[in-house]
Amino acid sequence: MTKPIVLSGAQPSGELTIGNYMGALRQWVAMQDSHDCLYCVVDLHAITVRQDPQALREACLDTLALYLACGVDPKKSTVFIQSQVPQHTQLGWALNCYTQMGELSRMTQFKDKSQKHANNINVGLFGYPVLMAADILLYQANEIPVGQDQKQHLELTRDIATRFNNAYGETFTIPEPFIPEHGAKVMSLQDPLKKMSKSDDNRNNVIGLLEDPKAVMKKLKKAMTDSDEPPVVRFDIENKPGVSNLLSLMSGITGQSIASLEAEFEGKMYGHLKGAAGEAVVGMLEPLQERYRALRADRAYLDQVMRAGAENAQARAEVTLKKVYEKIGLLV
């Protein structure tokens, strides 16, 4: 039986967090046996905001090494850097011609980023979702792991693919959102009503995958709980979001049920919960960081992974691009 094709990626801007790991990267690793997986470092998306060129190159290597340290296996998955597969931008341009201005102007992420980067509202930022559609449609992906912030972009991808298929006959697979069964949503440490984000300006909200263990413990000691007296360790997202976030985090790392954690911390102070959460996070990160350091030091191996991944991705992408070019009247 043919495995479903899945594609996902992360920008090499800002260090990947425990939220990225528990909410996405762990699922990427788990899917490698059941799916045909393509995982890319989306550096072309990163340049919609100004980047230091050398820092961006280093960040691409950092992100690639982190993928591998988390368990992404280049023998099982196609792992590549987006800009090393030129078919992404080639298809992106073609799809621009089948996307309406009104559709893009409704994208909430464009509105948010325009406010954040008011001095650099460029066409690339506006057309970002079309390149994302090309990323997905190039490989005929069936399933796309998406967070809440990317759902709207996936809907646009489906609309573009359907429009093209209606005009030229079956060309693109219509991708479905993939919602993992056991995906953990890690919230901000200081503001547990919002998701932990690697682009958060307040670094006390975030724990990076390469964070120093002492810094991890310090941040978790400062994590928001509540002012209940006496303290009550109970999972209640509506009334106790901070405590619930710490319980969810521990459960996601240790595999313990929320109920057993509630029983374990019954009658204890919030400091006990924070300390235990810190130890769980550090215990998860230390072996990952060790693998990362070894991989990041081996530039020849990273180059080999990039080269093999790009070759594989290009061969697959070219099949779709050729089909599209033929249908729209370009010489191939």
From Swiss-Prot:
Q: What SUPFAM superfamilies does UniProt report for this protein, alphabetically?
A: Nucleotidylyl transferase
Q: Could you tell me the keywords of this UniProt record?
A: Aminoacyl-tRNA synthetase, ATP-binding, Cytoplasm, Ligase, Nucleotide-binding, Protein biosynthesis
Q: What is its main location?
A: cytoplasm
Which residues does the annotation say bind L-tryptophan? 135
Per the annotation, the residue ranges of the short sequence motif 'HIGH' region are 12-20
Q: For this protein, what is the EC number?
A: 6.1.1.2
Q: Which reaction does it catalyse?
A: tRNA(Trp) + L-tryptophan + ATP = L-tryptophyl-tRNA(Trp) + AMP + diphosphate + H(+)
Give its localization.
Answer: Cytoplasm
Binding site residues for ATP: 11-13, 19-20, 147-149, 186, 195-199
**Which stretch carries the motif 'KMSKS' region?**
195-199
Q: Which InterPro entries match?
A: aa-tRNA-synth_I_CS, aa-tRNA-synth_Ic, Rossmann-like_a/b/a_fold, Trp-tRNA-ligase, Trp-tRNA-ligase_bac-type, Trp-tRNA_synthetase
Question: Is the keyword ATP-binding in the record?
Answer: yes
A biological process term (GO) from this entry: tryptophanyl-tRNA aminoacylation
What is the recorded function of this protein according to its Swiss-Prot or TrEMBL entry? Catalyzes the attachment of tryptophan to tRNA(Trp).
The UniProt family comment states:
Belongs to the class-I aminoacyl-tRNA synthetase family.
| HAMAP family linked | Trp_tRNA_synth_B (MF_00140_B)
**Protein name in the entry:** Tryptophan--tRNA ligase
- Its gene name is trpS
